[in-house]
Amino acid sequence: MTMTVIPQNSPIQATGRRKTATATVILKPGKGEVSINGKDLEFYFPTFVHRYEVFKPLEVIEGTKKFDIIAKARGGGLMGQAQALKLAVSRALIKYDPSYRSLLKKEGLLTRDPRMKERKKTGQPGARKRFQFSKR
């Protein structure tokens, strides 16, 4: 697979998914500003855990203040969206500079988590749970 290197100053778009959440990221060189669905990062993700997920790829390449991120996240919950953003940012960084691939791969940031919610089966109250069994 050949990687085409994108000019360093042009914006880069990438997509990431987790469970039912989808995130689209536009990454461009800047001073570390992050906007998700038109809101600032601190307002969209009030807890540190979610913000850490988004910044993890940038911390690995030591570029937290090098890039501006404009993102759209939809579907799922906050953690699913944060993890979808993490994958999207990682993919965008590789498009920006393919040499980041080994660093991000080593940290497991390029793997799409395939786990999804298991469907509810007929004749049971949930995916695995059974109705109470009565012998008599």
UniProtKB/Swiss-Prot annotation:
A Gene Ontology molecular function term for this protein is: RNA binding
Q: Which residues form the signal peptide?
A: none
One GO term of the biological process aspect:
translation
Q: Where is the composition biased (Basic residues)?
A: 117-136
Q: InterPro entries given for it? A: Ribosomal_Su5_D2-typ_SF, Ribosomal_uS9, Ribosomal_uS9_bac/plastid, Ribosomal_uS9_CS, Ribsml_uS5_D2-typ_fold_subgr
Chain positions covered by the region annotation Disordered: 111-136
Keywords assigned by UniProt?
Ribonucleoprotein, Ribosomal protein
Superkingdom of source: Bacteria
- Its GO CC terms? cytoplasm; small ribosomal subunit
Q: What's the short name of a Pfam family annotated to this entry?
A: Ribosomal_S9
> Which family does the UniProt entry place this protein in?
Belongs to the universal ribosomal protein uS9 family.
Task: Please identify the protein, giving its name as recorded.
Answer: Small ribosomal subunit protein uS9
Q: Which gene encodes it?
A: rpsI
